[in-house]
């Protein structure tokens, strides 16, 4: 099976999203509501294109092996270094087949059954976080609830809900302060100072992930606040036009945080080859969001599992052809640019 076949199952089942056979941002451009990007809409496309600039150094002069895709992330073994990225307000942006509660249920359950985890989206309705936390608890903590940068009292209310589930980690997509459709909400999402973020993190018993880091200085601030991991992300281009692609800034962030803080990356990653590229540039794992939305709308939990399987097979193929027997063997010497 290919991603194009998975996307074909979703065509006609989604709203603003076209379920394109290649999810490169060209069809949706700046269409919001919908999966488009902010302003000109080209950040999403540049995210996708940037990974393609890195060429693979093929090396088949090695002993035969079966690639080991397992990886450790914050004390949990994952079947592959791929996680489902958080998506919110799916009914508005993708169609009425799911709402945030049922979408979170779909990806959490499917990801856990495939040996990895899903980040869950936040929402204005309390039951969004409540439902995600409840299911994560039943799945033995296999999930990462993601909270928007709301006012401090709202953030703490949501933290109280998710901490009881003992998740792998808790995340905040700090760049969501730039989402135009959140600014007019009550309460609005807003910016967080290092001091404010540190106070939030100090209230958590679980590792805390800061999502939406796009510079070395931003990464250093997240580490100073106490982050256990950062996600290099420009929110799929939905929060600020004119920013670099995530692939462009990933190496700088990796250098800035050192070895004690995990680095994840999303944005335009669409294949096992892209996963390999991200790992070679220093990422510990990757997130995909839009493709998993398409997979879920196409065939529910099975669609999500199918996409994980496709990515796993593609990554294993590239590892074999480049001489990487394990995830730890992948390094930048396996790329040319």
Where are each of the predicted segments found?
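Structural signal for hydrophobic packing residues in well-ordered secondary-structure cores
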Residues: 51-58, 111, 163-166, 204, ...
């Amino acid at each position: 099976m290919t991603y194009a076949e998975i996307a074909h199952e979703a065509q006609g089942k989604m709203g603003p999203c076209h379920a394109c056979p290649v999810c490169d941002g060209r069809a949706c451009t700046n269409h919001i509501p919908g999966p488009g990007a902010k302003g000109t809409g080209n950040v999403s496309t540049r995210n996708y294109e940037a990974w393609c600039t890195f060429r693979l150094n093929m090396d088949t002069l090695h002993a035969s092996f079966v690639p080991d895709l397992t990886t450790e992330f914050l004390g949990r073994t994952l079947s592959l270094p791929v996680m489902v990225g958080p998506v919110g307000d799916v009914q508005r942006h993708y169609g009425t087949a799911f709402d945030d509660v049922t979408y979170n249920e779909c990806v959490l359950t499917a990801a856990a059954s495939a040996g990895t985890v899903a980040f869950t989206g936040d929402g204005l309705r309390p039951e969004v976080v409540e439902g995600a936390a409840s299911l994560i608890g039943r799945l033995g903590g296999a999930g990462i609830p993601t909270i928007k940068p709301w006012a401090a009292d709202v953030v703490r209310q949501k933290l109280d809900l998710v901490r009881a589930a003992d998740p792998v980690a808790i995340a905040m997509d700090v760049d969501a302060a730039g989402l135009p459709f959140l600014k007019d909400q009550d309460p609005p999402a807003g910016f967080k100072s290092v001091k404010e973020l540190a106070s939030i993190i100090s209230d958590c018993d679980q590792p805390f992930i800061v999502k939406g880091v796009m510079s070395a200085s931003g990464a250093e601030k997240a580490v100073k606040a106490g982050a256990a991991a950062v996600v290099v992300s420009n929110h799929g281009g939905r929060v600020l036009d004119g920013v670099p692609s995530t692939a462009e800034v990933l190496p700088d962030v990796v250098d800035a945080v050192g070895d004690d803080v995990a680095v994840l990356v999303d944005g335009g990653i669409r294949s096992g080859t892209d996963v390999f590229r991200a790992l070679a540039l220093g990422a510990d794992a990757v997130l995909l969001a839009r493709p998993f939305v398409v997979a879920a709308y196409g065939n529910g939990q099975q669609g999500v599992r199918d996409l994980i399987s496709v990515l796993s097979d593609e990554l294993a193929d590239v590892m074999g052809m480049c001489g990487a027997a394990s995830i730890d063997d992948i390094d930048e010497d396996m790329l040319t640019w």
